UniProtKB/Swiss-Prot annotation:
One of its GO terms (cellular component) is cytoplasm. Homodimer. HAMAP family: HemL_aminotrans_3. Its EC number is 5.4.3.8. One of its GO terms (biological process) is protoporphyrinogen IX biosynthetic process. It catalyses: (S)-4-amino-5-oxopentanoate = 5-aminolevulinate. The lineage of its organism: Bacteria, Bacillati, Cyanobacteriota, Cyanophyceae, Synechococcales. Coiled coil: none annotated. This is Glutamate-1-semialdehyde 2,1-aminomutase. The gene is hemL. CDD domains: OAT_like (cd00610). It comes from Parasynechococcus marenigrum (strain WH8102). Signal peptide: none annotated. PANTHER family: GLUTAMATE-1-SEMIALDEHYDE 2,1-AMINOMUTASE, GLUTAMATE-1-SEMIALDEHYDE 2,1-AMINOMUTASE 1, CHLOROPLASTIC-RELATED. GO terms for molecular function: glutamate-1-semialdehyde 2,1-aminomutase activity; pyridoxal phosphate binding; transaminase activity.
Length: 428
């Protein structure tokens, strides 16, 4: 496979941008080799600057649930852009998307649009503290809530419970109020509440962990968190930036039947354009300026292009049969991957929920980030390169979930499973 143009462009980029990329995972550091530079995307496919075609299971890290460059989304954007790219003032499209989100997501009575998942999580943390008058927050090892200082506490390490920062430039004082617990461990959460009486503003988590691979909540875990937070006067926050509108139209909270107090969103609700949102109970959201005293603002928040793409994407997802198709596609894919790994004699555990999937090259079960670290990352790197050679683009990390879309066909899944068979045999 010729990637000479990708290599040349990435080589030049390294002198222009730190590491040659605008987001670290794109640099392929954890899988080896040089990153692929894309030229265009359409449906379930991506083409690089050398003309190589890939079946894509990243989907722009989640937003492309209808497939890349869906013609109805593109048409709506072409019409919208003629009216301007950003107003810096209210637009009616905000109302439309807000109503769609409120109608779909059980916890959301009011919503505020921002420009990224990180922004949404930053704002919701401030809101949790403002509403409760408390400073401490519990997060879980392996759960990612953006790159804001207060969430950059190293997951799964010996210092995690001490609230020490995971990046230079983050003062210890900033993360001192960030408490961590292993995912799926209710007893650890109970202990943190006992050790910090009347001091914890809330608990935030990915209801399905997608930034430590793919880890599902065990039966009773989410329900237990709901009970604990109510008992201690704390708020429960679901970070649904990844799961929102992906595993069901109402997100993970609708799928699992557990309603948090607040929810953060992103990715799908922008249809591939930069977007984020947070929402929840009306009494809590009433704290947000200008209705209340908790300040948060954004130059491009609620811009007409992101709103347009989000509206059209949600309209497409609401069509009958959308999530049934996504579920069938993903289940067929993960079953095929498992069969291929077993045939090659490799340890494997994996699963899926609707249009989200993941696997580990280790024996299961994987309940938390500590379990996930048992995966064979070196072998995954070899697997990733082997799959690229066979025209399949997976997330360039052993600790990221994968995504399917409405555009993936049965033929795409069959071709992907065949590529896994050959690649697993190669790396076994």
């Amino acid at each position: 496979m010729n990637t000479s143009r990708s290599q040349a462009i990435f080589g030049a980029a390294q002198g222009l941008m730190p590491g040659g990329v605008s987001s670290p995972v794109r640099a392929f550091k954890s899988v080896g080799g040089q990153p692929i530079v894309f030229d265009r995307v359409k449906g379930p496919y991506a083409w690089d600057v050398d003309g190589n075609k890939y079946i894509d299971y990243i989907g722009s890290w989640g937003p492309a649930i209808c497939g890349h460059a869906h013609p109805e989304v593109i048409s709506a954007l072409q019409e919208a852009i003629e009216k301007g790219t950003s107003f810096g003032a209210p637009c009616a499209l905000e109302n439309t998307l807000a109503e769609m989100v409120i109608d779909a997501v059980p916890s959301v009575e009011m919503v505020r649009f921002v420009n990224s998942g990180t922004e949404a999580c930053m704002a919701v943390l401030r809101l949790m503290r403002a509403f409760t008058g408390r400073d401490k927050v519990i997060k879980f090892e392996g759960c990612y809530h953006g790159h804001a200082d207060m969430f950059l506490v190293k997951a799964g390490s010996g210092v995690a419970t001490l609230g020490l920062p995971d990046s230079p430039g983050v003062p210890r004082s900033t993360t001192a109020n960030t408490l961590t617990a292993p995912y799926n461990d209710l007893e650890a959460v109970k202990a943190l509440f006992a050790e910090n009486p009347d001091a914890i503003a809330g608990v935030i988590l990915e209801p399905i962990v997608g930034n430590a691979g793919f880890i599902q909540p065990e039966p009773g875990f989410l329900e237990g968190l709901r009970e604990l937070t109510k008992e201690h006067g704390a708020l429960l926050v679901f970070d649904e930036v990844m799961t929102g509108f992906r595993i069901s139209y109402g997100g993970a909270q609708a799928h699992f039947g557990v309603t948090p107090d607040l929810t953060t969103m992103g990715k799908v609700i922008g249809g591939g354009l930069p977007v984020g949102a947070y929402g929840g109970r009306a009494d809590i959201m009433g704290m947000v300026a200008p209705a209340g005293p908790m300040y948060q603002a954004g130059t491009l928040s609620g811009n007409p292009l992101a709103m347009t793409a989000g509206i059209k994407t949600l309209e497409l997802l609401k069509q009958p049969g959308s999530y049934e198709k996504l579920t069938a596609t993903t289940e067929k894919l993960i079953a095929g991957i498992k069969e291929a790994a077993t045939a090659a004699g490799l340890p494997f555990t994996g699963g899926s929920v609707s249009a989200m999937f993941g696997f580990f090259l280790c024996e299961g079960p994987v309940r938390n980030f500590e379990d996930a670290k048992a995966t064979d990352s070196e072998r995954f790197g070899k697997l990733h390169r082997a799959m690229l050679e066979r025209g399949v683009y997976l997330a360039p990390s052993a600790f990221e979930a994968g995504f399917t879309s409405l555009a993936h066909s049965e033929a795409d899944i069959e071709a992907t499973v065949n590529a896994f068979r050959e690649s697993f045999a190669e790396v076994a």
